[in-house]
Structure formats: structure tokens, C-alpha cells
């Protein structure tokens, strides 16, 4: 019978900036199980100012999880007990809900999709409205959110 699992983001369940097949699984599940995965995002350099919700575990991760490379904080890995090497796995994303009321955009010279277009480092905090599913840019423009990954 399929089970429901929850994998929280914590200092013992995340790794920062890399993938590695040798990582110990943070969770083991059977095929057909449902997993709710909590995620966090961003280093201390992109935290928002006062008035935003910052999950306490994000600050603990900043203090206690080594940042091996530039990149995202990843929750997991998850081991599928019956999976074999070279098998293709089907993962269905049922729903995505925001945990924070902010996101960020970070631009660095000589990086990203337009490396020659930006000559200064810029960080922008974007207010997120989970109920309206909108992001509000600092100058007031509101954009629809369609989380997909």
C-alpha cells in the first residue's frame, strides 16, 4: 500500500551546490509513494530585508551546511527502493506551494543568458503573494506566478 512521506529541509537533509551519486539518501520510499518535499533557496547574500518571512532552517543551513560550489540548496536525495540502475523513473509533480513571501533575481556581469549586457551586480527582492499567485517587482509591476519545478 502506498505511503505518504514528508522530507523537510534541514541541515541533515540538504546539500548545497552539487549533485553526487554517493550521497546517503535523506529518505527511502517505495514506488507509488507520495512525498512532500520542503525546499529553501538562496545564500545569506540574497536574504530579503525586514518584513519578509525567512524560514529558520534556512539560517541554520547557512551556518552549518558547506557550500561546495555556486548553486542551489538541494533537498534529498530520495532513494526509490525498487529502482535499478539504468531504469527510467516517472515522477509526477502534483502541486507546488510557496513557503516564503519572497524570491530574488540576481544578476552578475559575464554570467547568465546575457553575459555582455549587464556590467554591475544587481540583486532584486520580489514580493510573492501565494493567494493571488503573483510576484510584485520593486517598482510595482505584478506578474503571474506559475511554479513548475
Question: Where do the protein language model's features map onto the residues?
Answer:
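Short, solvent-exposed loop/turn positions at domain surfaces
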Residues: 22-24, 74-77
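Extracellular beta-rich ligand/substrate-recognition surface
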Residues: 67-71
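A mature extracytoplasmic/lumenal domain signature
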Residues: 41, 93-95
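Conserved beta-strand/loop scaffold segments within soluble protein domains that form the structured core
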Residues: 78-81, 109
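A generic structural signal for residues embedded in beta-strands
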Residues: 37, 88-91
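Intrinsically disordered, low-complexity linker/loop segments enriched in Gly/Pro
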Residues: 72, 95-149
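N-terminal, Lys/Arg-enriched amphipathic/low-complexity engagement segments
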Residues: 2-66
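Residue-level recognition of short, solvent-exposed, well-ordered loop/turn junctions
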Residues: 30, 81-84
Amino acid at each position: 500500500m502506498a505511503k505518504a512521506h514528508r522530507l523537510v529541509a534541514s541541515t541533515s537533509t540538504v546539500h548545497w551546490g552539487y549533485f553526487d551519486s554517493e550521497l546517503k539518501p535523506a529518505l527511502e520510499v517505495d514506488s507509488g509513494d507520495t512525498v512532500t518535499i520542503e525546499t529553501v533557496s538562496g545564500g545569506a547574500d540574497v536574504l530579503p530585508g525586514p518584513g519578509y518571512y525567512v524560514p529558520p532552517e534556512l539560517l541554520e543551513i547557512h551556518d552549518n551546511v558547506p557550500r561546495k560550489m555556486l548553486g542551489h540548496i538541494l533537498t534529498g536525495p530520495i532513494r526509490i527502493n525498487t529502482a535499478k540502475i539504468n531504469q527510467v523513473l516517472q515522477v509526477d509533480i502534483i502541486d507546488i506551494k510557496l513557503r516564503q513571501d519572497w524570491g530574488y533575481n540576481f544578476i552578475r556581469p559575464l554570467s547568465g543568458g546575457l553575459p555582455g549586457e549587464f556590467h554591475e551586480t544587481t540583486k532584486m527582492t520580489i514580493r510573492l503573494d501565494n493567494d493571488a499567485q503573483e510576484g510584485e517587482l520593486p517598482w510595482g509591476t505584478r506578474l503571474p506566478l506559475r511554479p513548475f519545478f
